[in-house]
Amino acid sequence: MDEATGELRPRTGARQEPETHSWLVLGKAVHDMASGRIDLHAHYVPDFYRQALLAAGEEHPDGIAAIPGWDELSALRDMDELNVRTAILSISSPGVHFGNSDHAIALARQVNEEGARLVKRYPGRFGFFATLPVPEFDEAVVELRYALDVLGADGIVLESNQRGVYLGDERLEPIYAEVAARNSVVFTHPTTPFGAEHLSGRYPRPMLEFMFESTRSVADFILSGVPNRHPSLRLVVPHAGAALPVLVNRIDMLLPLLTKPGDGAAPSAREAMRQLHFDLAGAPVEELLRALLSVADPAKLYYGSDYPFTPADVCVGLAQELEKTSLLDDGLRDQMFQGNARALLPRLSSTDA
C-alpha cells in the first residue's frame, strides 16, 4: 500500500519453495551487491501469518483494501529491481496479538523463527526485527531473549500501541532494559490508534492516522523519559518522524508550563530528536524531509521502502525522489541508503551477513 494515498494493489500467490540455485535465478551475486541499498523498513507476510490474520477477522487490517501478497522469491526479485542489497524484515500492523494470549505467544515465536529461516537461507539479503507478544509482558521478555540471543534478530519491532500499550508505558521498561543491555535496536511501526472506533472511518488509517499515531506514541516515549533512562537505546521511528519534526518547538515551549511542581526537569523534545533514528519510508520529499533535517542527526537517517504494503513500482518512484532531491548531498544520500544502516547494524558490513 502507498502510505500517502492508501492505494493497495495486492499480488497473490502462495509461497514458493526456493531452489538451491536461487542466487543465479535472482540476479545479482553477493559481490555485486556491495553498493546496494539497505532497506530498514520492509515487511514479510508468510502464508501462515496471512491465515492467522484472516482467522482473526483481519481481512482488511487497518482499513486497507486487502492483505498484500508476499513470497520470498518475489521479494528478492523486487529487491533487485530496487537495488536493495539487504532488507530488514518485520511483521507490520496489526502484529500478532488479536485477543488470545496463548495464540499471540505462539504466533510471535512462529514469525520470528520464519524470519531467522529467511536470514539463514539467503545470506546477506535479509535481516529481521523480532515480534513480541505485548501486552503479555513476561512472555515478551522471554521471546526477546530467544529472538536476540538464539535466533540472531537484528532488534525488535513494537507497534505504536499494542492493545493500548503505548511506547512510554512503564510496563515496557524491562523490554527496553533488555534491548539496551544488548546494544540492540527497537523499530516502531504505526498501527490503528487505540479507541479508533471514535475516529472517522472514511479513509484507510495508514493514510493519515498512522502518521498521527506514530507522533502520539513517540512523543509519549520522549515525554515519559525513556531516552533519559536508557541513553543507549536506539529507537527507529518510521516515515521520517511523522509530525514530530514540526511539533518540536511546541512541545518544548508548552511542557515546562504544564509540568507540575516536583515533577523534575522536563525532557527536551529537541534533544531527544537528535537521539532518535528515522527511516524515510513513505513520501518524505520535499516538505517532511526538510523539516526532519532541521532537527534530526543526519547520521541516523535510513532508507525504507515499506514493501509490500507499498507496491514495488511505487517503491521505485519514491527511491528515485530520494535520489534526485537537492535536500541531500551525495555524501548524505549514500549514507542514508546504506552507510548509516551499516553503523546501526555492524553485521551488515560483512558480505555474508
Residue ranges and their predicted role:
Residues 43, 191-192, 241, 308:
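Catalytic metal-binding/acid-base residues of hydrolase active sites
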Residues 2, 6-11, 16-40, 45-86, ...:
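Mid-to-C-terminal alpha-helical segments outside catalytic/metal-binding sites
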Residues 185-188, 192, 212-223, 227, ...:
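Conserved N-terminal glycine/acidic-rich loop preference
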Residues 38-42, 87-89, 127-130, 156-158, ...:
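Hydrophobic faces of well-ordered beta-strands that scaffold small-molecule active sites
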Residues 23, 32-34, 43-70, 100, ...:
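Active-site gating loops and adjacent loop-to-helix segments of metal-dependent hydrolytic enzymes
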